[in-house]
From Swiss-Prot:
PROSITE patterns: UDPGT. The chain crosses the membrane at residues 487-507. This is UDP-glucuronosyltransferase 2A3. The keyword Glycosyltransferase applies. Its EC number is 2.4.1.17. It is found in: Membrane. The gene is UGT2A3. The keyword Transmembrane applies. Its main location: membrane. Glycans are attached at N313. Residues 24-486 are extracellular. Residues 1-23 form the signal peptide.
Amino acid sequence: MRSEKSALVFLLLQLFCVGCGFCGKVLVWPCDMSHWLNVKVILEELIVRGHEVTVLTHSKSLLIDYRKPSALKFEVVHMPQDKTEGNEVFVDLALNVLPGLPTWQSVIKLNDFFVEIRGTLKMMCESFIYNQTLMKKLQETNYDVMLIDPVIPCGDLMAELLAVPFVLTLRISLGGNMERSCGKLPAPLSYVPVPMTGLTDRMTFLERVKNSMLSVFFHFWIQDYDYHFWEEFYSKALGRPTTLCETVGKAEIWLIRTYWDFEFPQPYQPNFEFVGGLHCKPAKALPKEMENFVQSSGEDGIVVFSLGSLFQNVTEEKANIIASALAQIPQKVLWRYKGKKPSTLGTNTRLYDWIPQNDLLGHPKTKAFITHGGMNGIYEAIYHGVPMVGVPIFGDQLDNIAHMKAKGAAVEINFKTMTSEDLLRALRTVTTNSSYKENAMRLSRIHHDQPVKPLDRAVFWIEFVMRHKGAKHLRSAAHNLTWFQHYSIDVIGFLLACVATAIFLFTKCCLFSCQKFNKTRKIEKRE
C-alpha cells in the first residue's frame, strides 16, 4: 500500500515537472480601458497554463489595478499627471465633437488629441527604457515572449531593447495604416474598405473614389504627423536610425480581435490570426433583484443599453431624448448610466451604474442591445445572437456598426442628430422585424462553429512563439522589399522604358525608311 502511494506521488511529481517544462515567461505592454479587459482574459489563461506573466504599467492606469492581489506580476512606473484629465478631454471630444464631423475631419481631431498626449506617452516610455535598474531586471529575467498592444507606442521598442520576440494584439490601427505599412497587409482598394470610414466591401464608384482618397490621406498624413515623432525617439533610444514600421514589422504574430463572422472577406498575411470574441463566455445567473425585473417583462422581453465603460454619462438633453424613446417601447430596459436621472424616464426603464452585460445579453428574454459599437460589446452580442441598435461615437465604432448593418444584424442611428423618434423607430425595427434576430443568430452559429476557440487560438500562437523563438516561417518577404519593389514600381518603370525604347526605335526606323524612300523617288524622277 505504501509503495503504491509512493508511486502515485512520484507520478504526480513527474507530471508536474513535465507541465512546467512547457512554461514560459511573458512580458506584457498593454493599453488601458476596453483593450485591457480583452488582453486580461488572455493573461489569465496563460497563468492557468502555468506561465509567468509580468505586466508593465503606470501609476495612473484607469482599469489596470496593480494594487489588487493577483496572479499577475506588475512593474509600475510613477506618472505625475492626473489620470482623469486626458480621459475627460477625450470623452468630451468623442461625445460632443467627433460625431458631427466628416470622416477625414474626425480623424484629424482624434489624431490631434493623441498628438497632445503623446508627450505623456513619451514620458511613460522614457520612465521604462531609461530606468536602468528596471531594464537590467527585465533583461536578467529572460522573457520568452512579449505581448504588445501597439495602440500605445513603445512596446515594440522595449522588445527590441530586450531582444525578445513579440506578438501584437489589436483590433485596428488608425486608418489601418500600421497593418498595411508595417504588417504588409494586402488591401485592394476596390473591395477592401479603409478602416474607420464606415464603408463596406460593396462600394459604388464614388465610394471607391472616397476609399482611395482616404487611403492616401491616412498613409501620408499619419506618416508625417505621428510616425516621424516616434521614429526620432526610437532612433535616439536605439542609438541607430530606424523607423516605426521596422520595429513594429518584426512582430511574429498579429492577433486580430475579429473573425469572419464580423469581417468582410479579404486577403491576409499568414502571421495574422483572428481571435475575435475570445472574452465571450456563457451567461451566468443574474443578481436576484435584476432577475426579478427581467422576468417582470413577460413576453415582451428586455432591451440592454450600454455605451461602454468610457461613456457612462451624456448631456441632460441627450439623456431625456433617449429616456423618452425608451419609455415608449413595451420591453423593459436596463440602462447603464451614471448621470442625472432624466425627467422623461419611463417606469419600464431602470438605471444602473454597472450591469453584467454578457449575462444580460445571454438571457433568453433579451430582444435587443443598444450599443456604441465597442468591439467587446459587439462580440458579446454576436456570441449570444442578439440584434443591435448601433449608436457609434468615434474611432472603430463606425466601422463595427457598419459591418453589423451590412450583415443584417443591426440598425444604425447618428448619435449627434438622434431624436426620440429615430431611436424609437430603430428599436421597433430591430424588435419586430424577425430578419434581424435571424441574422444575429446566423452570425452566432458561425462564431461558435470554429475548429479552435478564439482564446485557445490566441494562447496557442503565444506559446508557439515561445517554443520556436519566433515564427519567421510565416513572415512575408514583403518586409524585405523597399516600397518601390513592393509595388513593382521598378519593374513597371523597366517595362515602360522597354516599350518607350521600342517605340523610339520603331519611329526611327520608320523615319529612316521614309527618308530612304523619298530619296529613291527623287532620283527616279530626275532620271
